[in-house]
């Protein structure tokens, strides 16, 4: 079929398998160009490995460190009449390129929150790898099915205490609007912590530990974002922030547990990037368009892949084997460049000046849109989007 982009709200409902493969290859080539990650991990489990930071982590481990990887994700394959999700095609491409280089690659497609996914991952590790030395936790999901009761819990992208109003961009109409979001109820806050907090990360590590598959010195990392006062009302001081604070709580508990075997658990605070997850957060697209332009001008721009490579080589797996620098909460900070005073002051000064008319000139808004559509495999140079492509892409994946 011939596949063109169809955008609805903040998601693109179509995906291009060839474009998604090109994205993955671009990240692999970037990783190889950086050279090997000295002292990197060799047997890695990535929970949430099909897009964004999770996919980049799997690529860094495999193509930067020669690691065997197991990826867990929840994606839809394509059928003859309908494309699959971008994450499906990303994972298929990763598997293809990893196997071509003789790297071990196995994937599990199912609900990562379930007991079943954990049991299947443990079974694979025991059968094929024995133990693992790194666990990356990179889930972004709006809903969690509680594994014991089967209850569906939903997260909310809302402020706490009072309504939040701010200048934002309508990404469908490319116009500047005033966005208003009502505050979360106590129940919505609690539910957001249940879905996006650290509980499932702990459940994964506890299950892996009890099964005896965590190697001596095993490291685990989960990803977070803090941002600045420009996004705090909707993010860090909102319902999502409470969940991310719970991730910090889990990190301390897990770090105590893993320290006994010479390992560690950290939250890594990453920079804002264009992902399916961030595009759903009110105000983030406008903030990203502003901060990206300034960071590009300063030579500090990083996408998902560059961020993760810096986390591996300059934090967790330093060439000299020294311990990573952490903040007062034991977090790895990769948002350090974004949070530079000059970068943030620029955004603060610019925010009130933005209009629909000057949006393209004062920000990297259209670059943001191009990067967003690229997540789904579109707008990539050298790809013929009028060509017939097969939406059915099969690979070595265990379906739960």
Curated annotation (Swiss-Prot):
The active site is at residue 235. Substrate binds at residue 225. Disulfide bonds: none annotated. Its EC number is 1.3.1.9. One of its GO terms (molecular function) is enoyl-[acyl-carrier-protein] reductase (NADH) activity. The record marks 75 as: Plays an important role in discriminating NADH against NADPH. It is an enzyme of class 1 (oxidoreductase). The keyword Transmembrane does not apply. GO terms for biological process: fatty acid biosynthetic process. Keywords: Fatty acid biosynthesis, Fatty acid metabolism, Lipid biosynthesis, Lipid metabolism, NAD, Oxidoreductase. It catalyses: a 2,3-saturated acyl-[ACP] + NAD(+) = a (2E)-enoyl-[ACP] + NADH + H(+). Pathway: Lipid metabolism; fatty acid biosynthesis. NAD(+) binds at residues 48-53, 74-75, 111-112, 139-140, 244, 273-275. Involved in the final reduction of the elongation cycle of fatty acid synthesis (FAS II). Catalyzes the reduction of a carbon-carbon double bond in an enoyl moiety that is covalently linked to an acyl carrier protein (ACP). PANTHER family: ENOYL-[ACYL-CARRIER-PROTEIN] REDUCTASE [NADH]. Belongs to the TER reductase family. Monomer. HAMAP family: FabV_reductase. This is Enoyl-[acyl-carrier-protein] reductase [NADH]. It comes from Shewanella amazonensis (strain ATCC BAA-1098 / SB2B). The gene is fabV.
